[in-house]
Each structure stands twice: as structure tokens, then as C-alpha cells.
């Protein structure tokens, strides 16, 4: 069976939404019964985004196999059913690292190592190797056509048409068609120049997807078709919409999936997008609104919490409520009035993070939620600060802290993971990184099994006793100090396979106060939601009703 390759590039400006378009197209092709996967090619020289600042790069998306990847992989998993792995994200840094290792081993037999053929051959081999079991591989090329960083990737995908046959390769170019308000015109010239730039590299796009503030009319499509040498049927108008989950429907309405199937000579049934129609319907017809506060330290760039934001919206869909999100800088809570800043919230969520900055503000938010019976959801560090707060103010451990912040505190209720060996059979896997900064030396990454206590609120929401969730942390609850905390009313309701780690906590004397060491947001999708997020939003709705009633 031949694999069909679809390459998606972007031009004119960055941030046009290549990831959303790629994922949306993949979802439509998947709905036609095709086995689909996506690979993101990133031009940055970092090996992975694991140590990049969330304020600069956005969130790090964790795959089931423990890879720290680009946030676009989160989009892919939310749109299609195929789970991403470390092989679905390839960076320039990873490529160069592998090429240099091969050179040092002598694999190139003394050849002068160059971009062409060695780097481009590595890229092509990566794509071919990791797409063998699929009908269609979509490849999103990061960056913008014309950037020097993207040239090796563009050369590699140009060569793919020769290596795997032009009939099994298709090039999609995403461009901007700006609207000039003074003249009331859509301008196609930037698109023409972007295609010209792509042609200079040797790539003739087969499909143009044109982003704009307005619907691109018939005359503009004819003009783009003529000057860019692309069929008019293959000029797709993609105007701004209020929901990214409308994109699959918009692509299907313009016949893009049918055009692609005919191009590849694929005989498959029409896509059934009824589930996406339901998502959009629920989004457009909410029964009410709840307000959730996200207390974080990276709020200058909300993409740092992309999966959390999406998971909250998914939970809103399942509850038929619109979720209004308020971002609260954790540092501000340390100096300003907590009551004023958190007033009017129906629920408080504290997401993950690293480092001491803003931690005391997060602790104050957990205390405020606990004392005022406001639904609280702590994720990773958010769980840890909830435990620290409870230990300090309920148990009486005034000096309680994490050894991440205070190494010699009297009550290290959160301490570094130590003494466990890395295994490959899901027994509390610890990833040991050699020759890197100490901050990543003992990171627990990827999907792990968790056993839930029967009858707990968490177990009732999941509806089962064994779950698999994704982790990214190197500090854990100190079991030796937890018994006293649990006796005071903060229970451990989820444990790792060998009971080495407490993964979930619940506050007994609170309507909904839950902390998870794992990151449930990475398993949430618009069509299914996630049990913890759905339960959290439901609790926020109940809290709102209670406040209104009183």
C-alpha cells in the first residue's frame, strides 16, 4: 500500500493557523475512513521544547510515550483519534543532533557532511519511516516560506515528490489575503508573491487555502487561480470564525476532502461530520455561563495553558455551558487583595508550572477556594500548592513547603522523586536525562497507570478504578508526612501501580476540591471532554446556582 503525503506550508505572515488547518483537514479525511497521522517539522534548533520558556513558545505538549513536544500536537490529538508520539515532532535540533552522531560514528564513511544530501535525506527518511502504517500522512512545515530556517525542510519535501512519486504527494500552501478597509478590497498580490517564493524553491502548490477577514469571492478566486497556476476548485476561502471547531465543516463544504481523494485516486465514503456539527451546535447554544479563574505565572502568553483552556471549553460543551476564563497573575495575589481578585469566580484552577515565582499566590488561591467552598482544581503544581496550603493552615505544619522551593524546610510535604529506576513496563517510569541541566535530571514523563480508590469522587467521575494519564514532574507528595495530612481531611484517592506515588487528592469537607499530579488536559477532546474537567465545570455550575439561590 502506498502512503499519500500532504505537505502544508505557510506564507506571507506567521500565525495563520497551519496547525489548525492541518488538524481540521486530517479530521475530515479520517471521517472518510482513512488512517491518518500528522508530523510537525519545527525549524528551531532546540532538540525539543522541553526547556523553552512557556512565555516565548507556549505550552509543552506531553505525548503518551513521554515526549515533550510542540503545542500543535495537542491540536492534532484534539481533532483526530490517532495518538501522537515522539516521532510526530521533528526539530532542526533533533535532526542536526542525529546527523552529527552518525558523522562521529563514521556512518558517512568520510564524506563531507552537508545540508544536501545528509540533512534532507534524514528528514525524508523520518517521514517515510513513521508513516508506513497509514493511508495519509499530513506534514506541517513550521515557519514561513522565505525564512532561512525552513529551507532544508522545504528542499526535503520537494525531493519527496521524486522519491515517492508525484502522484502520491500533494502540496497545500496557506496564505493571507488581506482586506483593505479604505478601499473595501481583498488584495491577492501577497498570495501571488508567496507562491512565487515557493516556486523559486521548486514547489508548485496544488491547493491554496486563503485566510482572510472576509469571504473570498468568485472573482478573487479566479484571479488567484490564474496567477498562481492552481485550479479554481483548489482555491479555498477560509475566513475568520469564532470557533476553530467549525473549520472541518468549512473545508468539507468547499469540497477540499473530495478534491484530495480524487487527486490520490482514493475511493472512500463521504465524511460524516455529525459529531463536529454537534460540537458547534453546543458551542453556539449554551444554557448559561460560568466563570473560571486560572491562577498562573505564564499568563502573559495564554498559549502557555493552551490544553487547559481547551479542556475547560470541552467541559463546557459537555455541560452545555459557556466557560468564561479569567487569567489571574499568581504574583499579584501575593501583594493585592485575594478576595477582590478572586471575587465572582465560580471555580478556581491552578495549572502546572516550575519554579518559586508566584507559588505563594497560588497557595493563597487554594486557601481561598477551600475556606469559601469554591470548586478548586489543582493540576501538577496546582495539586502540590493545595497540599502545602492544607498542611500549613489545617494540620499546623507552619513551615510546610516543597524542597523545590525550600530545600531545608521543617515539613517537606513535597519532595524530589528519588530512588526509582527507569523501566519500560509502566511501573512508575522515571526518565533519566544524561548531560543536561539538573532541572530535568529526574523527570517523570508520559502515560502512567493510576489506581483509584473505590467510592471516591474522582472514581465516580471516571466510572472505573484504573485510569491512564500523562505526567510531567520531578517532585511528588512525601508519603512519610502524608498520613497526618490525610487524617486531617485531605485524602489520597489515586495511587501509582506500586503505590510509590499519590497521584490524586480530595478534600473531604469540601463540595469539589481535587488535585491531580498528572495533566488531564492532554487527554481532553471537544467530542469527548475529560471526566475531571467535566466534573469541575459541573461543580462550578452547582456553586453558581447555590450563590444565586442564596
Swiss-Prot record:
Belongs to the CTP synthase family. Residues 1-266 are annotated as: Amidoligase domain. Pathway: Pyrimidine metabolism; CTP biosynthesis via de novo pathway; CTP from UDP: step 2/2. Mg(2+) binds at residues 72, 140. It is an enzyme of class 6 (ligase). This is CTP synthase. Signal peptide: none annotated. Catalyzes the ATP-dependent amination of UTP to CTP with either L-glutamine or ammonia as the source of nitrogen. Regulates intracellular CTP levels through interactions with the four ribonucleotide triphosphates. The lineage of its organism: Bacteria, Pseudomonadati, Pseudomonadota, Gammaproteobacteria, Enterobacterales. GO terms for molecular function: ATP binding; CTP synthase activity; glutaminase activity; identical protein binding; metal ion binding. The gene is pyrG. Residues 291-546 form the Glutamine amidotransferase type-1 domain. SUPFAM superfamilies: Class I glutamine amidotransferase-like (SSF52317), P-loop containing nucleoside triphosphate hydrolases (SSF52540). Homotetramer. One of its GO terms (biological process) is pyrimidine nucleobase biosynthetic process.
